[in-house]
Structures are given as C-alpha cells and as structure tokens.
C-alpha cells in the first residue's frame, strides 16, 4: 500500500558541523497524529523545516497521496504541508488580519475566510472572549500560540506540522488544543506531525518517534 505522506531522505548538520540527523525519511498513513520528541538542539525543528519544504534538499523526494512534488513544485507542497512555527509569528494588525493572512496570499486565492469558523475555533482553545478586531500586539505569547494553531486549522492543509505549538500553555489550554489537533488528524486525507516535550501528549499520539543521535526511531 502506498503511504499517504512520503518524504526524504534528509541529512543536516548544525552550525559547527555536527550531524543533527542523517538519511532520515518518513512514510506515514493519513488519519493519524505522529509525535516526534528528542533532546533540545537535536534537530527536531530543522527536520520539520525539511518536511514542510522550508529547507531545501536536492536529493530528497516528496510525495503526498500518491503524487510526487519535485523541487519546482515546492510552493504547492508548502500550501499542502503547513508548519505552525515554534515562535508563532504574527503580522501587525488585528486578530482577524492574522487568521486571514494565509488566505490573502497567492496559494489562498479563491479560498474563503469564515468569521464564524474562526470564532468557533477560538472558543475551542479558550479564546472565545477575544473579538476578531483585537490588536495582535496586545496578546500574550500563549494566546499567540493558540491563534497560530487556529490559523493552521482554518487553512486546512493535508498535513499540519506543529513545532512545540502547545508550549507555555496552562493544562486546560493544552488539553483543549491537543484535542483539536487529534480531531483534525483523524480525518481521512489529513495528517498531523507534531513536536512535544510533554510525555503525556506523546502518549496520546497515534505514533511516537524519537530523534536522537542522528537517527529517527520508533518508540511505539
């Protein structure tokens, strides 16, 4: 059976020339949440950038749902395999401006933005009290992390890649946000790949991988 998501092999070194990982590939089915953990500085964020096409490797293959995406089609790949970055970058403007931002780009042409869906998802992560016209600069780091998650879910990519998106949240917000990720992941034709440092979250994922000593290995 052909895997839903196939990517690699990737190799990377840090700024001092030390190997972060070597010949790492992923072959994953849809309808699941895959957690990746490992020591700090071990290359997890770098690997996610390769998976999403934000870092380029000329020798790596990329396939999604039976379709290959060569390097010339990286912009298409990036619209289908979306990264929620660890620092939750935002643009100047309102909460609505930030949620709408992907839809204003070339890849989002023709895709509608639904205020009602935005409010529903914000309520699901405990931010229902925030009006959509609230200035983003007035929000805390934890609120921005949850807004970045909502933005990724609204974009509805085939593969959602989350880099420590739930870091710094209170336990209630972590549970609510992870439940949303799981619900998204369990849909046919969807996949979530995430990095957590929380053993409880790794245990709830459908698959648990560990990146350490340059290798990506199955934990369960």
Predicted regions, residues:
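Conserved catalytic motifs of ABC-family nucleotide-binding domains
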Residues: 87-101, 107-109
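Helix-to-loop junction immediately C-terminal to a conserved catalytic motif
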Residues: 52
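ABC ATPase C-loop
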Residues: 152-153
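Catalytic Walker B motif of ABC-type/P-loop ATPase nucleotide-binding domains
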Residues: 160-164
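ABC ATPase NBD Q-loop/coupling interface
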Residues: 61-76
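Conserved ABC ATPase signature
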Residues: 135-139, 143
């Amino acid at each position: 059976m052909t895997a839903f998501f196939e990517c690699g092999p990737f190799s990377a070194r840090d700024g001092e020339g030390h190997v972060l990982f070597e010949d790492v590939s992923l072959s994953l089915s849809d309808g699941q949440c895959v957690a990746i953990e490992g020591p700090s500085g071990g290359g997890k964020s770098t690997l996610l950038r390769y998976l999403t096409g934000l870092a380029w490797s000329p020798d790596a293959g990329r396939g999604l749902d039976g379709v290959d995406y060569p390097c010339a089609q990286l912009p298409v790949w990036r619209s289908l395999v979306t990264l929620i970055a660890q620092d939750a970058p935002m643009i100047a403007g309102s909460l609505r401006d930030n949620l709408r931002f992907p839809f204003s780009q070339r890849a989002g042409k023709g895709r509608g933005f639904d205020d009602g869906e935005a409010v529903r998802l914000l309520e699901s992560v405990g931010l229902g009290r925030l009006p959509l016209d609230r200035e983003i600069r007035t929000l805390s780091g934890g609120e921005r992390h949850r807004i970045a998650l909502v933005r990724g879910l609204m974009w509805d990519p085939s593969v959602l890649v989350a880099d420590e998106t739930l870091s710094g949240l209170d336990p209630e917000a972590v549970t609510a946000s992870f439940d949303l990720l799981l619900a998204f992941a369990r849909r046919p034709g969807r996949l979530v790949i995430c990095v957590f440092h929380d053993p409880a979250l790794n245990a709830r994922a459908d698959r648990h991988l560990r990146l350490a000593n340059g290798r990506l290995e199955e934990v369960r």
